[in-house]
Swiss-Prot record:
Induction summary: By p53/TP53.
Protein name listed in UniProt: Metalloreductase STEAP3
Record's keyword annotation contains Electron transport: no
Organism: Homo sapiens (Human)
Top-level taxonomy: Eukaryota, Metazoa, Chordata, Craniata, Vertebrata
Keyword Glycoprotein applies: yes
Length: 488
């Protein structure tokens, strides 16, 4: 284990062979680093490659010197803090007290705290690591920075990872110096204010997909509900009433029946809050009143809900491709062939069923293709290359087309099954009839908002008109242009 811990995170061969990480001249700006861990090694490598002269302070420089790039000077901590004006403190919070013996040499210098607490420590301590470091060294200027950047991102530089570096501190000159260093290293500094903001900055790396929690719980809840419903209809009912064991359907067949239901409902929930927001604006007669908190949060989570809808739809397509590979499907084909022979039927063809299958498969492929476009354009690299009109056209117009195609796909799949008594197992309606409720409401509401008497009023409200205002307001001549200026 000790031998494995001594292995460098960054290959020295790569460091010495990379021309961008060559030795820097003596007149280069000097930067100090206290610490010899993985982050300190990556930081030293990036600083050397950015043209800085790096001095690393270690308690055992002989053992750790070979782990750093050859251009970095590794020495004792007392010598490392003597000349640099900016010193990175790359040690954990519990080791801050071991640096108190250097307080005289550190007086007047800029200390850059790059540490991160654990989730338990973050909740336990009232003050941030940076504020605690500032209390131990009152004669120094402490700046919080680079704590959201991983060792790998530092190693890769601006070619990979998130380039934004939140920076906070009480001295503008110190923040400016650290910001210039971040720019020289290929990152984008973001001023987060005073050192009191360090607690919030340190919480950033601890967050685990905060915007995805509610949509994920929603998708899981829908999946569990529809899965239980399909289990009762497709597995439990034949077992209870017909003594047929169909529990083999649970891993694939029931899952494949559940996934499109979840995807369809999630897609409708992407556009339902926009309908509710438009109805609320029409009722209030103004756009200057805030939406309720629940609606505001719903609107902010539409992207995540839409991506989960696409994920479920893609899984449904994959599961559908796997259906013919099942052994149960092969047995069904053999049994059907035997029944056809026993019935002395040489030709089995139902024109209505053939057309229904062809149509609903085609509509399903079109819906999935449209959803794929929505998913691709939601990527930041693609979304940033589109102007507002292009982005709103894809996400709003094409998204609504995807919802309509999904509705037609569901209707052609169901066909006349909703009116057949045999489909109501345990007096429960077919699953697809339950999924149609919310999407049909959204489609009908969207169609209602397209009526001229409503669309013109909504367009005026979104351009600043208020029902209670006495100021006269007229739409521009190009009404179509006015409608495209705002989308909810």
């Amino acid at each position: 284990m000790p031998e494995e811990m001594d292995k460098p995170l960054i290959s020295l061969h790569l460091v010495d062979s990379d021309s961008s990480l060559a030795k820097v001249p003596d007149e280069a700006p000097k930067v100090g680093i206290l610490g010899s861990g993985d982050f300190a090694r990556s930081l030293a490598t990036r600083l050397v490659g950015s043209g800085f002269k790096v001095v690393v302070g270690s308690r055992n420089p002989k053992r750790t010197a070979r782990l750093f790039p050859s251009a970095a000077q590794v020495t004792f901590q007392e010598e490392a803090v003597s000349s640099p004006e900016v010193i990175f403190v790359a040690v954990f919070r519990e080791h801050y007290s071991s640096l108190c013996s250097l307080s005289d040499q550190l007086a007047g210098k800029i200390l850059v705290d790059v540490s991160n607490p654990t989730e338990q420590e973050h909740l336990q301590h009232r003050e941030s690591n940076a504020e605690y470091l500032a209390s131990l060294f009152p004669t120094c200027t402490v700046v919080k920075a680079f704590n959201v950047i991983s060792a790998w991102t530092l190693q890769a530089g601006p070619r990979d990872g998130n380039r934004q570096v939140p920076i906070c501190g009480d001295q503008p000159e110190a923040k400016r110096a650290v910001s210039e260093m971040a720019l020289a290293m290929g990152f984008m500094p973001v001023d987060m204010g005073s050192l009191a903001s360090a607690w919030e900055v340190e919480a950033m790396p601890l967050r685990l997909l905060p915007a995805w929690k509610v949509p994920t719980l929603l998708a899981l809840g829908l999946f569990v509900c529809f899965y239980a419903y399909n289990f009762v209809r497709d597995v439990l009912q034949p077992y209870v009433q017909e003594s047929q064991n169909k529990f083999f359907k649970l891993p694939v067949s029931v899952v494949n029946t559940t996934l499109p239901c979840v995807a369809y409902v999630l897609l409708s929930l992407v556009y339902l809050p926009g309908v509710l927001a438009a109805a609320l604006q029409l009722r209030r007669g103004t756009k200057y009143q805030r939406f309720p908190d629940w609606l505001d949060h719903w609107l902010q989570h539409r992207k995540q809900i839409g991506l989960l809808s696409f994920f479920c739809a893609a899984l449904h397509a994959l599961y559908s491709f796997c259906l013919p590979l099942r052994r149960a499907h092969r047995y069904d084909l053999v049994n059907l062939a035997v029944k056809q022979v026993l019935a002395n039927k040489s030709h089995l063809w139902v024109e209505e069923e053939v057309w229904r299958m062809e149509i609903y498969l085609s509509l399903g492929v079109l819906a999935l293709g449209t959803l794929s476009l929505l998913a691709v354009t939601s990527l930041p690299s693609i979304a940033n290359s589109l102007n507002w009109r292009e982005f709103s056209f894809v996400q709003s117009s094409l998204g609504f087309v995807a919802l309509v195609l999904s509705t037609l796909h569901t209707l052609t799949y169901g066909w006349t099954r909703a009116f057949e008594e045999s489909r109501y197992k345990f007096y429960l309606p077919p699953t697809f009839t339950l999924t149609l409720l919310v999407p049909c409401v959204v489609i009908l509401a969207k169609a209602l908002f397209l009526l001229p008497c409503i669309s013109r009023r909504l367009a005026r409200i979104r351009r600043g008109w208020e029902r209670e205002s006495t100021i006269k307001f007229t739409l521009p001549t190009d009404h179509a242009l006015a409608e495209k200026t705002s989308h909810v």
